[in-house]
Amino acid sequence: MTDQNETQDTNPVTTRRGVRSFVLRQGRMTEGQKKAFDRNWAKYGLSRDNGMIDPREVFGRDNMLNLEIGFGMGKSLADMAEAAPEQDFIGVEVHLPGVGALLKEVESRGLENVRVYSIDANDVIDLCLPDACLDRVMVFFPDPWHKKKHHKRRLIQPEFVQRIRHKLRVGGILHLATDWENYAEHMLEVMSASEGFANTQEQGGYSPKPDDRPITKFEKRGESLGHGVWDLLFYRTN
């Protein structure tokens, strides 16, 4: 049986130095997650060792390709993949319990249109995905790093957005969502100033929640407490 700590020791989560947008928590996979991981990683898992992939070869077809960065426990990604079998989905998550949970969902639902990386999204972008291969990139509820001294750790930064841009086809969508108002304002400021992107909202500002973005249990809980959620949808113009 695969040992999760050994997996990330022999295949480091990131090759990048400097500020990280994530902290590796010490949580361990449950027995069910470990078993799902061991049964399914060979089929659904991707790694840096695969190098620059050809999505058409990975999925055996040339369909709409989505990338979700930081899928958490994976239920929303599984919901989207199940609801859109004609689309393909690549998920990225550094926390192995989430990877195990997603693989359990993928197996139980019989999904064939999902593949998974368990490394830093920066490495996936730089080392694994060819330019202009993605139709949509989704970053839902990333860590807001709410203390001002930690804002530099926020994933959505001008340099990161430009690297995402090159992986999107022209017309492709970058969809961001957060339940932290200050981060929403930061995202809108970054995206509005980003070369090669335009807001899908003609008047600028935030977007209504698209029907195909699942509502998470945390989002439902937040809504019941009166918390807001902000969606931003920008498309690549050039």
Swiss-Prot record:
Keyword set, alphabetical order: Methyltransferase, S-adenosyl-L-methionine, Transferase, tRNA processing
Cell inner membrane keyword on record: no
Entry protein name: tRNA (guanine-N(7)-)-methyltransferase
Keyword Transferase: yes
GO molecular function, one term: tRNA (guanine(46)-N7)-methyltransferase activity
Pathway participation: tRNA modification; N(7)-methylguanine-tRNA biosynthesis
InterPro entries hit by this protein: SAM-dependent_MTases_sf (IPR029063), tRNA_(Gua-N-7)_MeTrfase_Trmb (IPR003358), tRNA_methyltr_TrmB_bact (IPR055361)
Active-site residues from the entry: 143
Enzyme Commission code(s) on record: 2.1.1.33
Catalytic activity: guanosine(46) in tRNA + S-adenosyl-L-methionine = N(7)-methylguanosine(46) in tRNA + S-adenosyl-L-homocysteine
